[in-house]
Structure formats: structure tokens, C-alpha cells
Design a protein with these regions (language model features):
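Short, surface-exposed acidic-centric catalytic microdomains
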Residues: 8-37
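Short acidic active-site motifs
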Residues: 12, 41-42, 63
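Glycine/small-residue-rich loop that forms an oxyanion/phosphate-binding "nest" at active or ligand-binding sites
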Residues: 26, 30-51, 56
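Donor/substrate-binding cores of folate-linked one-carbon enzymes
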Residues: 53, 57-171
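Generic recognition of long tandem-repeat/solenoid scaffolds
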Residues: 173-176
């Protein structure tokens, strides 16, 4: 079983996890008087599960540095662009696709990366490009990036890590042969 932690009480995945017998909890910053108290609570909850790998998807909160250090090269994130484009503070969800269309890029995509102290700055595990069409809206582009890149990259990255096919050397991901 893979424990599931979310920031949002109303997400369908929380219900799905519980229905599948997967331990599921909500640790939301809204429930704590400060970010520091939330960070401590999040780390404590994660430690209870003793995870080998932490997978972030739509986790719109910067991971506390204490947690990044505790789980160095064991936290991964999926980002809906080809990092280093359209990433960092303020680039999440639909905003990423709005900015890509405003800029007029012809190709966008998704990136799976290890989480470090920076925002979308960790070693890149995998990327997949997706074409941008002339008549795209942010919503259409977001859907295409999810279907053609994110939903493929993330499970493959988890599988590669779980089976020892990748490692981080000098701040870069290397694929073991």
C-alpha cells in the first residue's frame, strides 16, 4: 500500500485512496496558525508512513527545506512545462499554459524532477514535448499536456526509481544501464 497525503479535503483521489484501503490523510496549511507549524506537521505525518519515495502531483506548496534534506533525492514532482521554461514561483496549473500561449511557443510539455530547496529547480528525471496548436486555449493545452506527457512520464519515473534505473550524480540524473 502507498499512503496518500493531500492538501485538499475535497479531492476525489482522497476518497479513491480510502476506498481502495490506502491510508489517506489531509494535511492542509489552512489548519495551522503558521507555515512553520504546518511544515512541522507535514514532516511528522510523512515520517509516520516511512516512505521510500514521495510523489508530488498538483501539490501547490513549497516543500519545507527540512523535509527536502530528510528525503534528499526521494521526492519527485511533475511540472506541466519543459523546465526551465514556465516554472518557478507563480507557474502552476493553468497559469503555465496561459503563459506558454502568450509567449507563442510551438512546443511545451512536462517535466518530472527531483525536489530540492528551489522551486522547480531539482535534477530533471524525464521530459516529454507536446506540440502547441494554433487554436489552443489554456484548457485544451493543459489537457493535451496531461494526456500526452504527464500521465506517461510520472508512472515511468516512479517505476525507474523503484527499480534502480536512475540515480543522481553531481546534481544530474543518470540512467543506469
Amino acid at each position: 500500500l502507498f499512503p496518500y497525503t493531500t492538501l485538499f479535503r475535497s479531492v476525489k483521489s482522497l476518497e479513491r485512496a480510502r476506498n481502495a484501503g490506502i491510508p489517506a490523510v489531509c494535511v492542509s496549511p489552512k489548519d495551522y496558525e503558521s507555515r512553520e507549524v504546518f511544515n512541522d506537521a507535514l514532516l511528522a505525518k510523512v515520517k509516520e508512513f516511512t516512505p521510500d519515495l514521495i510523489v508530488l502531483a498538483g501539490f501547490l506548496v513549497k516543500i519545507p527545506e527540512t523535509m527536502v534534506h530528510e528525503y534528499s533525492n526521494r521526492i519527485i514532482n511533475i511540472h506541466p512545462s519543459l523546465i526551465p521554461s514556465f516554472c518557478g514561483v507563480g507557474y502552476y496549473g493553468l497559469h503555465v499554459h496561459e503563459k506558454a500561449l502568450e509567449r507563442g511557443v510551438k512546443v511545451t510539455g512536462a517535466t518530472v524532477h527531483f525536489v530540492n530547496e528551489g522551486m522547480d529547480e531539482g535534477p530533471i528525471i524525464a521530459q516529454k514535448a507536446v506540440a502547441v496548436e494554433d487554436d489552443d486555449t489554456p484548457e485544451i493545452l493543459q489537457r493535451r499536456v496531461m494526456e500526452q506527457a504527464e500521465w506517461l512520464l510520472l508512472p515511468q519515473a516512479v517505476d525507474d526509481i523503484a527499480n534502480g534505473r536512475i540515480c543522481v550524480v553531481d546534481g544530474k540524473v543518470k540512467h543506469n544501464k
